[in-house]
């Protein structure tokens, strides 16, 4: 049975590893028994569906299918994390993103994951991912090309998140004309 998740990362993480999602490791675990900081990350399975949200930029980057089991991963961008490989199912039109605030406040949609639209951000605070209903997933998917909810890449901010600061990145990146991060 397919499960559905709302993954909270940031634009920088997506540009670094757009084919993966990650979760920090619990600091108190023994090396032989490493565990993800958010236990729900363990529950994700191959074939599950995710909505990829870029925190701080307020945009949905697309919907994806999980392609791998959880595995340990480490490189200079993502040192010592658990990852899962992902593959895009549907992305917004090139150079555009689905703006979550526009979708929430300029539509009549009700979302199970955000029972109180005014407090939508509190449902995500401190989360890497959150379980969502298929109905919510379908609403996000359906609106990835709905022009009234889209913003261009030039309209979004890419803040340096606490995760990125912890990795030694203190300057906000810029998206180049080729869609890559510049200034890093």
Task: Give short role names for the model-derived ranges.
Residues 170-184:
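Active-site metal-binding core of divalent-cation-utilizing nuclease and nuclease-like domains
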Residues 65-130, 134:
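Aromatic- and Lys/Arg-enriched surface recognition patch
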Residues 1-46, 132-168, 179:
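Compositionally biased, charged N-terminal/linker segments
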Residues 54-59:
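Short, charged beta-turn/beta-strand-edge "cap" motif at the junction between a beta-strand
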Residues 7, 63-64:
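GIY-YIG nuclease signature motif recognition
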């Amino acid at each position: 049975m397919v499960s559905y998740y709302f993954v909270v990362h940031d634009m920088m993480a997506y540009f670094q590893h757009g084919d993966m999602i990650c979760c920090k490791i619990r600091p108190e675990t023994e090396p032989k028994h490493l565990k993800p900081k958010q236990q729900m990350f363990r529950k994700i399975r191959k074939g599950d569906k995710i909505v990829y949200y870029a925190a701080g930029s307020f945009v949905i980057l697309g919907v994806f299918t999980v392609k791998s089991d959880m595995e340990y991963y480490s490189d200079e961008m993502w040192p010592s994390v658990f990852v899962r490989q992902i593959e895009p199912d549907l992305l917004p039109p090139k150079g555009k993103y689905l703006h979550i605030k526009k979708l929430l406040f300029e539509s009549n949609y009700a979302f199970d994951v955000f029972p109180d639209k005014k407090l939508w951000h509190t449902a995500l605070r401190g989360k890497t991912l959150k379980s969502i209903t298929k109905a919510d997933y379908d609403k996000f998917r359906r609106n990835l090309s709905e022009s009234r909810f889209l913003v261009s890449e030039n309209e979004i901010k890419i803040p340096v998140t606490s995760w990125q600061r912890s990795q030694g990145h203190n300057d906000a990146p810029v998206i180049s004309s080729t869609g890559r991060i510049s200034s890093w």
